[in-house]
Amino acid sequence: MSKEDMIELEGVVIEMLPESRFRVRLDNNMEILAYGSGKMKMHRIRVLLGDRVTVEMSPYDLTKGRINFRHPTANPGAGPRPSHHHRR
């Protein structure tokens, strides 16, 4: 399936599940099960409860999706999130 066939929607993470999965409520009030994309894992982009995300879904299964983008937080003074990877 090509990228043009995918449906892209926005939503909010409402629940964090085991194995890097998330329950996301889309803007149309549908709830889906989503996982982080490989690029997000590779660059250690953390997705937390309440984050606004962009989800890519297949038209054949509208209950599952892949999180492609985590939108910046609305609080500009919050600063970057702490990393758990510290060098000694």
Swiss-Prot record:
It is found in: Cytoplasm. SMART domains: S1. GO terms for cellular component: cytosol. Keywords: Cytoplasm, Initiation factor, Protein biosynthesis, RNA-binding, rRNA-binding. Its main location: cytoplasm. Residues 66-88 are annotated as: Disordered. Residues 1-72 form the S1-like domain. GO terms for molecular function: ribosome binding; rRNA binding; translation initiation factor activity. CDD domains: S1_IF1. Pfam families: eIF-1a (PF01176). One of the essential components for the initiation of protein synthesis. Stabilizes the binding of IF-2 and IF-3 on the 30S subunit to which N-formylmethionyl-tRNA(fMet) subsequently binds. Helps modulate mRNA selection, yielding the 30S pre-initiation complex (PIC). Upon addition of the 50S ribosomal subunit IF-1, IF-2 and IF-3 are released leaving the mature 70S translation initiation complex. Component of the 30S ribosomal translation pre-initiation complex which assembles on the 30S ribosome in the order IF-2 and IF-3, IF-1 and N-formylmethionyl-tRNA(fMet); mRNA recruitment can occur at any time during PIC assembly. Belongs to the IF-1 family. This is Translation initiation factor IF-1 1. It comes from Chromobacterium violaceum (strain ATCC 12472 / DSM 30191 / JCM 1249 / CCUG 213 / NBRC 12614 / NCIMB 9131 / NCTC 9757 / MK).
